[in-house]
Amino acid sequence: MWRDKVKEYEDFILEDLKGLLSIESVREDDKASAENPVGPGPRQALDYMYKIAERDGFGTHDVDHIAGRIEAGKGDDVFGILCHVDVVPAGDGWDSDPFNPVVTDDKIIARGTLDDKGPTIAAYYAVKILNEMNVNWKKRIHIIIGTDEESDWKCTERYFQTEEMPELGFAPDAEFPAIHGEKGISTFDVIQNEKADDQDEPEYELRSFVSGQRYNMVPDEAIANVAVKENMTDVIQNFEQYLNEHDVEGESVVDSGVLVLKVQGKAVHGMDPSIGVNAGLYLLNFLATLNLDKTAANFVAFSERYLFESHFGEKMGMKFHTDVMGDVTTNVGIITYDNQDGGKFGINLRYPEGFEFEESLTRFKGEIQSLGFSIELGKNQTPHYVEKDDPFLQSLVQAYRNQTGDDTEPYTIGGGTYARNLDKGVAFGAMFSDSEDLMHQKNEYITKKQLFNATSIYLESLYKLCVEE
């Protein structure tokens, strides 16, 4: 029944999704203002969702242009569908324009198809279809739309300062059948705050280093500018040998007497950095072979001692595992250095229930202080968990099983979704077990089958939970 109903709307779903995907809704702090709190792109995407909602007869409510909601249904209780329309930067290496959606016979290719614009449109259409069926709602539906999920969650932080908190809800921002637990997520900067003096002119001076744009992405590019006193050819040859030995890509060029070294890695979501290739850490690992100026040498040595080839907090003394949520993970998403101010490592650490985060960070902070480094804590979100046998969760899972015939159990993840804003919130789709996970990677896509099947699952689940029989 539900899949047949979705068939009537497939062309409309694709058109509305293409419009949303065409908006480059990446956070841009340098363009932020009161009108565009995290930049013009995310604001434009938020307004786009208001526009299609008003076209379809729904009410909307804006919260300071950084978040808002689409309203449907009726009743005392509120059911929340928590979505986001911001995306991570596209990065390089795409086979097509990431913000000019390509629609083939079986897929839609663009940044945000999986995370989270495709699932957002699927959930929206589930509500739209039910509304156009003139169902007898027993709950109010709030489709809550954020614009800063990929960075600091300023959107939901502001939204829930003044707006009603749903009793139940889901975030269509992960996988089916359902995610009932999410690791704690923290971001912090390790800052080099002591410069060392060189008594003699160094053989190699690190002028600058840059890698990564987001804490929650494994950086796929790193660039270092090195002033070479002598033996330039030897350094270039050693760099090429290093790339071959470590099976990573890169290049070197000489620009105005300065050696520019570049490494290409593999960007993946920061929740599991072990499956990516961190370009920044590999380039620092090569720089460790050079007799650098002392300040740079201390920066590189820090990476070697605590970060390189340590995806699970081992080198920082934070290794921890539970059977329910798995391992601590550490992603070094941002690395910067210049010869005037020193360097910074931007770290995204994810941890399971039972991990003593504050105690561990305090210990690590004390350990690195003597090395000339300090820590600035950004955001820390504690782990989130809903019991697997909760009736609400089971209702969602049953809708999934009815539509797919798959009896896979709900599970926990290292990622973080808006579901953790709710006491009883879970992540629910829109990826399936056979979906290729290209979130935060080049050539991100969603299949039409996945998009329409997710819409059908959302339809059935919302009908069971929010409509009078």
Curated annotation (Swiss-Prot):
Active site as annotated: 86, 149
Domain of life of the native organism: Bacteria
Listed InterPro entries: Bact_exopeptidase_dim_dom (IPR036264), M20A_pepV-rel (IPR010964), Peptidase_M20 (IPR002933), Peptidase_M20A (IPR050072)
SUPFAM superfamilies: Bacterial exopeptidase dimerisation domain, Zn-dependent exopeptidases
One GO MF term: zinc ion binding
Free-text cofactor note: Binds 2 Zn(2+) ions per subunit.
UniProtKB keywords: Dipeptidase, Hydrolase, Metal-binding, Metalloprotease, Protease, Zinc
Cofactor(s) the protein needs: Zn(2+)
GO process terms (BP): L-arginine biosynthetic process; proteolysis
EC assignment: 3.4.13.-
Binding, Zn(2+) 1: 115, 150, 440
Binding site for Zn(2+) 2: 84, 115, 173
Family classification: Belongs to the peptidase M20A family.
PANTHER family assigned: ACETYLORNITHINE DEACETYLASE, N-ACETYL-L-CITRULLINE DEACETYLASE
Stored NCBIfam families: dipeptidaselike, PRK07318.1
Name of the protein described by the UniProt record: Putative dipeptidase SSP1012
